[in-house]
Curated annotation (Swiss-Prot):
Organism listed in the record: Human parainfluenza 2 virus (HPIV-2)
EC number(s) from the headed UniProt entry: 3.2.1.18
Name of the protein this chain belongs to: Hemagglutinin-neuraminidase
SUPFAM superfamilies: Sialidases (SSF50939)
GO molecular function annotations of the record: exo-alpha-sialidase activity; host cell surface receptor binding
Virion surface face of the membrane: 47-571
A single Gene Ontology CC term: virion membrane
GO annotation terms (biological process): symbiont entry into host cell; virion attachment to host cell
Stretch list, region Involved in neuraminidase activity: 228-233
Listed transmembrane segments: 26-46
Domain notes per entry: The C-terminus (head domain) is involved in binding the cellular receptor.
Lineage of producing organism: Viruses, Riboviria, Orthornavirae, Negarnaviricota, Haploviricotina
Pfam families: HN (PF00423)
Stretches of the chain found on the membrane's Intravirion side: 1-25
Localization: Virion membrane; Host cell membrane
Amino acid sequence: MEDYSNLSLKSIPKRTCRIIFRTATILGICTLIVLCSSILHEIIHLDVSSGLMDSDDSQQGIIQPIIESLKSLIALANQILYNVAIIIPLKIDSIETVIYSALKDMHTGSMSNTNCTPGNLLLHDAAYINGLNKFLVLKSYNGTPKYGPLLNIPSFIPSATSPNGCTRIPSFSLIKTHWCYTHNVILGDCLDFTTSNQYLAMGIIQQSAAAFPIFRTMKTIYLSDGINRKSCSVTAIPGGCVLYCYVATRSEKEDYATTDLAELRLAFYYYNDTFIERVISLPNTTGQWATINPAVGSGIYHLGFILFPVYGGLIKGTPSYNKQSSRYFIPKHPNITCAGKSSEQAAAARSSYVIRYHSNRLLQSAVLICPLSDMHTARCNLVMFNNSQVMMGAEGRLYVIDNNLYYYQRSSSWWSASLFYRINTDFSKGIPPIIEAQWVPSYQVPRPGVMPCNATSFCPANCITGVYADVWPLNDPEPTSQNALNPNYRFAGAFLRNESNRTNPTFYTASASALLNTTGFNNTNHKAAYTSSTCFKNTGTQKIYCLIIIEMGSSLLGEFQIIPFLRELIP
């Protein structure tokens, strides 16, 4: 039987797309050249002496065929443009769905043989394959998206079963074939460094009998081997999941105070239940970074690389510290005037990256980049963001949406609104020297925080506060010009609607300048923490759904329980 274990699902539609697009474009250009040549030939060979200037009738008789030819040329060009821009992409999506479905049938039907495959192929319901990691409404959309009622789905996230300890730090990744999910199971209390185990699962989206999606768990592994993995981030890759964690042996504050880097681990979990873990060593980090932490939010698989969001502390006086210490990013709120001169505000913004509580380390965001060509690689690189384009280092999430790269950064510093960036770095030429990002201007949504960096803070100050609450862009957030607010930009998620306390979890949709629709729970004092949101579309019904994962306070079993909420989003 043929071995499908090395079959790359992504390569099929991409290769098909390139061939069809290039062929159509070349044919269109050739047609235009031929028609233009024909018209020019007709013009050049006009017999001017035969009476072109003699009478209006003769002029009209000569010009009219040219006009008709030009009309035909324009009509043909419009048809080619319509075919290339609309018809062909739709057909590609249809072909792609058929290919995925056929492959799934081969792996799950009579042709499947577990002795020569990496396990049964995981694949979402066909109605969802082409509705994932796409912009879900048009860029020109400027309406008010609203949430439908909570949908009663079976939870794919196991809860704590003991009053001691808690479950925390969810990370969720979704690609065209399957999803991956992980969280930390803290055994004694709910402190970051307490002894813990790690839960990791993968599964698929299925259509329920009630005509809405459910998340079916297909594979799970519970890592209870005595290794205290923390701050784990997950990424779905072809064939399975990748888990990136650091091993905690001391508190976060102690991690920043020392120069002895904690152990970093990269684990691969495949369809056939194979689990392979590597300890990774990053070049040019020892002696420069005090600590390196996975940034909790999910990573991405892009152009043969696995990318994870990272943050940590740079040691003063090192080359990395010196390179970044003069850089700072200072977004502006148009309706808020900050005290002090511009130079004073700039100085405050620059100093906001260095945190006294964390032994005066410079808090830095970065991306861990690992080639997937060696699927069990321990060869990874850490590439820093340019601090003149992003805020102080913090937890975050990476996205690939319509082949564009984006980055959410937790608002842990003085800017209280959600931080979302377009990544402009080109990975097609290999690992870059630095990550370039462009801020998506937005003054929503707030997060709770301590003074002087509470929920209404937009002026430079030195603090470390806030809470992780990633966003999901519903349409293209690209501004019309540099740092110009896009009035049509819409995004969704959940936030903690309180000035300073981690309470009152609330679902929202927002524009760059206003909350558009909010719905919460009856108890506005209910405790909560991290939130993570992922929206997608059923391309058959055209319905949009948002999966919103929230760490909800629990008074019975542990301090927190992680709950997945599913709602339809109505544009």
